[in-house]
Regions:
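A short, basic/aromatic helix-end/turn motif that makes direct DNA contacts
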Residues: 26-32, 138, 147-155, 162-165
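Major-groove DNA-contacting interfaces characterized by cationic-aromatic clusters
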Residues: 60-115
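Short, basic (Lys/Arg/His-rich) helix/loop patches that form interaction surfaces
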Residues: 3-4, 17, 95-150, 157
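Catalytic-site neighborhood detector that most strongly recognizes the C-terminal catalytic loop/helix
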Residues: 41-45, 152-177
Length: 190
């Protein structure tokens, strides 16, 4: 299996399922074929409750229908594994280094290098932000903050603080136009 396919699997899991890169270490497919994600963040809030798993559901990139299902099937089949650098880091049992291994792996690939050059500030975590954006903006109907926060493994407050930065005037007008039949862009200034 070529290394490109292995990286594609890792990028697909992080980007299409909204994972923290470190969560590549705590994935499993349950008996119903759903992706489950263990905990990697153990902050004060998380320490007060038992470790649990959350459901991760893919949100496809528009025009790439079924890609999340395909990535999940590849992962579940075991025919395509995560890249060796990530697997050996997972074996050490620490989570943060898994995210670092993912970042270093991406930085070696020309496709990521060209994306990063064209989009200053792009990081591996941007794949997770893209998931949040698609859940709220890419489709005619959007997921609620509460639902998307649960899928991403954080609270609605954290979601609003860190994943709502793309709100701008044009986006607000578009959102209202999708909700109503009033074309706000046709308004004429007095």
């Amino acid at each position: 299996m070529g290394s490109r396919a292995l990286v594609h699997l890792a990028v697909g899991l992080v980007g299409l399922f909204g994972l923290r890169p470190a969560e590549l270490a705590v994935l499993r497919v349950d008996d119903e074929g759903r992706l489950r994600v263990g905990e990697v963040k153990r902050n004060r809030w998380a320490m007060r409750r038992a470790k649990s798993e959350r459901l991760a559901v893919g949100i496809d990139i528009p025009g790439r229908d079924g890609e999340g299902r395909r990535i999940l099937q590849l992962y579940a089949s075991g025919l395509v594994k995560l890249p060796l650098r990530i697997l050996t880091t997972i074996e050490r049992g620490e989570f943060k280094p898994v995210g670092e291994a993912f970042r270093k792996l991406l930085e070696r690939y020309p496709f990521w290098q060209s994306l990063a050059t064209a989009n200053p500030g792009l990081t591996p975590y941007s794949l997770r932000h893209g998931y949040a954006w698609r859940g709220h903006k890419a489709y005619e109907r959007s997921l609620s903050v509460r639902d998307l926060a649960a899928l991403m493994g954080h609270t609605p407050a954290v979601h609003l603080q860190h994943y709502g930065k793309w709100t701008d005037e044009a986006g607000l007008i578009d959102a209202v136009e999708r909700l109503t039949t009033d074309p706000l862009t046709a308004l004429v200034a007095p």
